[in-house]
Amino acid sequence: MAAVSSAASLRGADYENGLRGGAGPSGGGQDPGEDDPMGRGTLDLDLELLGQGRRSRRVGGRTAPGRRSGGRGGSGGGGAGGLEELEDEELEEEEPGELTGDQTIEDPELEAIKARVREMEEEAEKLKELQNEVEKQMNMSPPPGNAGPVIMSIEEKMEADARSIYVGNVDYGATAEELEAHFHGCGSVNRVTILCDKYTGHPKGFAYIEFSDKESVRTSLALDESLFRGRQIKVVPKRTNRPGISTTDRGFPRARYRARASSYSSRSRFYSGYTPRPRGRVYRGRARVTSWYTPY
């Protein structure tokens, strides 16, 4: 509205000046539109100011400094063209600035996402390497354990059994270290084996001790019926399992039978240390077990 009112006032002033400007050769008033440059210039200035007001509203009410003065000082066409170019340049400068600001906001987020993806890929590669190493170790470890019993011949097993003893009535809470310490005075101990139930994992109450020489076996027999963890243990030489005889462990009754068989010399001596009742239980128990497991 200010632009329109200023244009109207300027136009009225210019019109009065044109009328006062005197008469031409014929004595009449001079036409402002023919010779006076203010006539057409005033019209162009009005259009320019109107267009400037519209542009200022379109841009958002912000106009560059010196627009009106440039429009007044220059010609109508030149001033309007200069203002349009100036406005276009300002718009072009503002738009790239806004895009640049958006890019500066998005770039750190993209970089963070890319960095996270790289970290996840590195972790996946490390996990694959660890898994491959574990698989290699698992593939390499079973063969030595499985090859031991296969490589050992019957003669070697018999020789190892000749250096071993059977220890019965062992406390269920006993450990291999405690047994080794109990028989340490008899000689060098190579291995201590405490048998456990394969279903429950609980100890069966007996163990095998392997010495480095046969002399240690004879020395260890002196600990027969000695106290170990409050129990009187039974110490006898270990028997070698012969081919054709079942090696399945049937628990404590079999261990008692093995202990008796090791001291067997005659039929009368076999029955001398035991009452008929336990003997009958052992026999009937073994018979029932055999009948139960006939399908196997």
From Swiss-Prot:
Region described as Disordered: spans on this chain: 1-102
Top-rank taxon: Eukaryota
Biological processes per GO annotation: cellular response to lipopolysaccharide; MAPK cascade; mRNA 3'-end processing; positive regulation of polynucleotide adenylyltransferase activity
UniProt biased composition (Acidic residues): 84-97
Coiled coil: 107-141
InterPro entries: Nucleotide-bd_a/b_plait_sf, RBD_domain_sf, RRM_dom
One function term, GO molecular function aspect: RNA polymerase binding
Residue stretches making up the RRM domain: 163-240
Statement: the UniProt record of this protein carries the keyword Coiled coil: yes
Record's comment describing the protein's domains: The RRM domain is essential for specific adenine bases recognition in the poly(A) tail but not sufficient for poly(A) binding.
Complexes and interactors: Monomer and homooligomer. Binds RNA as a monomer and oligomerizes when bound to poly(A).
Record's protein name: Polyadenylate-binding protein 2
Native organism: Xenopus tropicalis (Western clawed frog)
Lineage: Eukaryota, Metazoa, Chordata, Craniata, Vertebrata
